[in-house]
Amino acid sequence: SILKETPYVVAGSMQRHQQTATLALNECFPEAEIITDSAWNEFNHQQVFAQYEPRFNEPHLLKEDVAKEDNPRAYLAKIFEGAIERWTGGDYHHEYEESWPDFKTRVETALQNLCDELAKTKPRYAVVFTSGGVISVAAGKVLGLSPNKTFALNWAITNSSMTTLRLVGNEPQLLSLNEHHFIKV
């Protein structure tokens, strides 16, 4: 185990967050309590893609389009970039269940609330099980990044990777991002 004692644990309420948290903790710290907080949930990718291109409201159509391309990853990156630019751009906030400013505020508030709680309770370690968009926004906040640079991070984040922050008082500092050398392929 990377950690020397039972951590303070938070997980988003999405199934993948809960499953990953349970699996990881059962291996290392079965006694750990998981605090579920939906503020750590991912944004609605499907809606962000569908508002950019209505056909993509059917996820299989996006998969079919991507599969037809000579360079599927580059094509998907282009679609992702366009969809994110539309979502974060400001002209269409009213068209989303959760606008970019609302998502950004939700994540930044969750991060600050966690930092405040950890500064008070002072556990040696804390672990949050969440998703790439949330991690990108949290890292973007700490680093002062623009939405475009924030989502450039999102595109690079690997599932089950680790990002490490440390607290100075109740202010987070980024120590590492997207560590995944421990994942065996």
Enumerate the language-model features and the residues they cover.
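ANL superfamily AMP-binding
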Residues: 1-5, 110-112, 116
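Phosphate-coordination/substrate-recognition cap region in phosphate-metabolizing enzymes
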Residues: 2-78
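Beta-strand elements within well-structured catalytic alpha/beta cores of enzymes
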Residues: 10, 123-130
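Alpha-helical packing segments of well-folded alpha/beta enzyme cores
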Residues: 17-20, 99, 103-114
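Short glycine/proline- and acidic residue-enriched helix-loop micro-motifs
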Residues: 61-102
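GST superfamily/GST-like fold recognition
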Residues: 132-136
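Domain-level recognition of soluble alpha/beta enzyme cores
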Residues: 146-171
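Acidic, His/Gly-rich catalytic cores of divalent-metal-dependent hydrolytic chemistry
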Residues: 172-185
